[in-house]
Amino acid sequence: MQPTNTIEPLPDSPGGGGDPSQLRLEALGYKQELSRTMSLADVVVYGLIYMVPLAPLAVFGFTYNLSGGMVAAVYAVAAVAMYFSAVSYSEMARQFPVAGSVYSYVRFGAGEFLGFMSGWSILLDYLLLPGLLCIFAAAAMHLQMPALPEWIWVPVFVIVSTVINLRGITFTAGVNLACLYLQLAVLVVFVVAVIVALHAGRVELSWAPLLGHGAFSPALVFAALPIAVLSYIGFDAISTLNEEAKGGGSAVARATMIVLAAVAALFMLQVYLAALFVPSGTKFTGDSAVTAFYDISAIAGGPVLKAIVTLTSALIAILANAIVSQATTSRLVFSMARDRRIPAFFAAVDRRRKIPVRAILMVALLSTGIGLVAINSSDLITSVVTFGSLAAYCLLHVAVMRYFAGQRDRRRWFAHRISPLLGLAILVYTLWKTQELARIVGVVWLAAGAVIYWFRRRVAAGATTQEAPSPPWDDAPG
């Protein structure tokens, strides 16, 4: 496919027979290689697992410290901030039913260079996240088995995740559904324990988790926003299934909005209830910042509830997230390798199971290394992961505004202009609030990506290679 001078959005329904999603994929210059077997419910479950219904557990202590106790307010503001990103993802998912998600969306919406940079940026998130999740799981397991060192759990969780993903996407979807049910069941048990505590007078309802113990402070809420936003980062994982979802982009767009609404309600509920048990002026320090929610579970329902919540968080919630995270990362690596943006070696697909085996194994090895090296640096890795995601989301908003710039459909005016502009402004502010060291690491990573893109472009200019399908224009420098 050659670059064109027009940038018209794709039609809602391509002409002719056949699967509309496959026709759109072929119109973009790709062929269907992955197995399109996932229903809307499967995609929603996949998104819920990736975003983890119990996600606030692992970072509750950090969020509470930074927000001065206004944890519910932080997650509410984070939900509003990520709504604009969800709208942009939904719009681009309908236009480009391709597995690369933000990489593909920005590439086709704003050109080769920004597309590569968005993929490179989100790759920072994806390459670190599986290892980070193994660190969180190892910390939770160490609470239950202190005789075993934390690091020994890292390869265990990586191996389990890899074995499940190598079974294929259908098997992974089944495991995800079982894990989701278990997480929701544990959350119900925690809510019931809090209700019992309220009835017994051991704790009282309060506005403090929303408004603070003293005067409401927007500065404190925004200070904790980067950590809370990490819990909502899952839209890209959903859209990596564009070539495996029945209904393609339409199913992905619907799933994105459903998942955001569901997790926003779950996140706000659990952090609000947990914060009721924390006395005013409390500051979690050392290991207590990591185990804060687990310790609160013991106050609410005794040591049995603490053990249930801890084991569920480690063995079910975080493990399930690690499985999905590994699957998502491998799909992004596959997509970029297929486009020859990274070595094509990783674009190989197993003919029988229709999964990117080499990409999965590469992610597994990298996750093990990161988990072992950064076992005591989870707060920094968390901030770096957030930086990578938010930087990619910023480029997504730019792509939406640029791609739809010539469209005059007033019905989509909010989605194509106002929403991406607001989303971009909020994300830029949130990026500025991340840790200074995380910003430095992120900027260095992006600079390295720009150099790699420039170098590969120069090499490709002197050689004949298989080119990826071209976007509407190419704004690459030089």
Give the role of each language-model region.
Residues E150-V203, P218, A255-A261, V385-L395, ...:
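Membrane-interface loop-to-helix entry segments
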Residues L54-E150, F157, V259-A262, M268-L269, ...:
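Extracellular loop-to-transmembrane helix junctions
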Residues V98, S121-C134, Y232-A245, V304-A344, ...:
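Membrane-helix boundary/coupling elements in multi-pass transport proteins
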Residues V385, S389, F414-G478:
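A generic transmembrane alpha-helix motif of multi-pass inner-membrane proteins
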Residues V175, F346-R353, Y393-R439:
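C-terminal membrane-solvent junction of multi-pass transporters and transport-like membrane proteins
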Residues S104-Y105, G111, H142-Q144, A255-S325, ...:
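TM-loop-TM module centered on a large, flexible mid-protein loop between adjacent transmembrane helices
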Residues V71-A72, P149, A178-L311:
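Helix-loop-helix junctions that connect adjacent transmembrane segments
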Residues M1-M70, M82-V87, A99, A208-P209, ...:
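Membrane-interface "cap" regions at the ends of multi-pass membrane proteins
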